[in-house]
């Protein structure tokens, strides 16, 4: 399975990418900003996108909207991740187009369960 991980923090990117790849089930593509992430989503067609919702862009929800508007990427599930753990953040993420939401700091086992659940859903 192919995962696209969009994360602006190099340490977080390396750590989570490495842990996911060690599971043996995943090929992990990395993007350091939302523009690169959206382009990779179109060209690589990952099975799921892990998207940092705290990217340094004017509108942090724009990458989600962009991916869900594009016919080539609209059906790729997005797991939004944010340091804001309030219910309102989850609700906003889901309303904007995320299929799942995970609060940071990431609990790896919980995220892995979420990724596998999303990948198991019929398309």
Task: Describe the role of every protein-language-model region.
Residues 8, 30-39, 60-62:
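Helix N-cap/capping motif at the beta->alpha junctions
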Residues 10-29:
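Two-component/phosphorelay signaling modules centered on CheY-like receiver
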Residues 17, 62, 85-102, 113:
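Alpha4 helix (beta4-alpha4-beta5 surface) of REC/receiver domains from two-component response regulators
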Residues 39, 61-74:
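Short amphipathic alpha-helix used as the core "switch/output" element in two-component signaling
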Residues 44-52:
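Active-site beta3 strand of CheY-like receiver
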Residues 55:
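Receiver (REC) domain active-site loop signature in two-component systems and cognate sites
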